[in-house]
């Protein structure tokens, strides 16, 4: 007979009464109530042992769970999450394994489930992401191949002044080389930060930035005073494509972590914010595991550059068959019978003209090509570089 509209518990009670009354075999009872013989014998056994109370739903949890996570492990994981709220289960477990290698730590998926069960995981908002463009920039295969730099977006401090965080990282090891709380974006404040980094860590091969100031400027090849200085030191400036911050994606991700751990809420004043940055960078470099590094720390994967910071800028050297000219403070150079304007940021520097065809010259500065110069029309055509 159909038993629609009857609750499972009422159905079990009816079965138990019919079982006690007798008159029907177990097979007939089970057919009558639409259950299997296995279920019928189970209900009958529970009724005989516990009465009607035995017919209620029983827990499906096993009596013994050999793979269950221990209370001490769960407590340690949750405590680590409270101390590092921006770390996921994978990073937390990697750090805990280093400090307590003999403990039976769970898999990252189990760790995530434990954190969620204890209310320590906040579901992130969905963010629309654009399609990444292929990056033409070379990867870093060892420390100091590429350093990346950027200004994290400014924010207001407790005293109503603004903080402009300047950050500098080694791309290969993820080491934070500098994180400076500056009151403004200006070359006069930025250059000393790079000088300290160069003294502490040596010189990189390439320095990657966006196209904003003071890393770039309007004018010929978007050279700035800062990038001219880098070139004089033998550092190749690299710029990501306009409108493509994903080409510096690891640095952008670092900025999100930096903001979450040091600026929510901001400090009372600039000096206090700098102390937060210093504490964060120490932990980020020496304690925070990185999945891209096999859960190692940046400090364990970094070594200083073998290229020391010079006490004086080395002179520029060009091939002997190039024609070298000194740029005036006005940004002009005398060439082909008249003045030729380049850019004021090259004032006092030496550039070189290489003849590549009859009446056609390539203009060089340090290791980069600046422009093509056509003598007949006196036309200067900039040559873009990365």
Residue ranges and their predicted role:
Residues 1-14, 63-71:
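Short, Lys/Arg-enriched anionic-surface-contact patches
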Residues 177-178, 371:
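A structural microfeature
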Residues 15, 29, 40, 51, ...:
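Mobile genetic element proteins and their domesticated derivatives, centered on retroelements
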Residues 7-24, 74-83:
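Short, amphipathic alpha-helical "recognition" segments used to contact nucleic acids or chromatin
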Residues 52-148, 154, 213, 224-227, ...:
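Basic, flexible linker segments flanking DNA-binding modules
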Residues 219, 225-310, 352, 356-357:
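Charged alpha-helix within mobile-element recombinases
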Residues 68, 109, 113-169, 173-176, ...:
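Mobile-element integrase/transposase regions
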Residues 281, 285-386:
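C-terminal, beta-rich DNA-binding module of retroviral/retroelements integrases
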């Amino acid at each position: 007979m159909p038993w629609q509209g009857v609750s499972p518990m009422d159905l079990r009670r009816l079965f138990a009464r019919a079982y006690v009354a007798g008159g029907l075999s177990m097979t007939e009872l089970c057919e009558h109530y639409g259950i299997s013989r296995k279920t019928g014998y189970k209900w009958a056994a529970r009724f005989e042992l516990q009465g009607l109370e035995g017919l209620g739903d029983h827990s499906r949890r096993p009596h013994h769970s050999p793979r269950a996570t221990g209370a001490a492990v769960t407590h340690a994981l949750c405590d680590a999450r409270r101390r590092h709220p921006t770390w996921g289960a994978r990073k937390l477990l990697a750090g805990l394994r280093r400090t307590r290698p003999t403990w039976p730590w769970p898999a990252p998926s189990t760790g995530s489930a434990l954190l969620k069960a204890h209310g320590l995981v906040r579901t992130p908002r969905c963010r629309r992401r654009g399609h990444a463009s292929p990056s033409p920039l070379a990867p870093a295969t060892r420390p100091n191949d590429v350093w990346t730099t950027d200004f994290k977006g400014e924010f207001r401090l407790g005293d109503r002044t603004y903080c402009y965080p300047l950050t500098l990282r080694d791309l290969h090891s993820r080491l934070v080389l500098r994180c400076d709380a500056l009151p403004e974006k200006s070359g006069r404040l930025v250059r000393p930060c790079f000088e300290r980094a160069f003294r502490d860590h040596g010189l990189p091969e390439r320095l990657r930035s966006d196209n904003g100031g003071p890393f770039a400027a309007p004018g010929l090849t978007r050279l700035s005073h800062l990038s001219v200085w880098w070139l004089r030191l033998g550092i190749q400036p690299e710029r990501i494509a306009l409108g493509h911050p994903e080409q510096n994606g690891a640095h952008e991700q670092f900025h999100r972590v930096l903001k979450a751990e040091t600026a929510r809420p901001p400090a009372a004043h600039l000096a206090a914010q700098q102390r937060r940055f210093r504490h964060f960078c120490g932990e980020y470099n020496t304690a925070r595991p990185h999945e891209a590094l096999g859960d190692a720390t940046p400090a364990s994967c970094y070594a200083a550059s073998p290229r020391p910071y010079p006490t004086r800028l080395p002179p520029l050297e060009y091939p002997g068959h190039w024609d070298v000219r000194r740029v005036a403070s006005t940004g002009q150079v005398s060439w082909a019978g008249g003045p030729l304007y380049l850019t004021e940021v090259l004032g006092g520097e030496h550039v070189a003209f290489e003849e590549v065809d009859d009446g056609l010259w390539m203009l060089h500065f340090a290791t980069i090509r600046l422009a093509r110069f056509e003598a007949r029309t006196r036309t200067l055509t900039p040559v873009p570089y990365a």
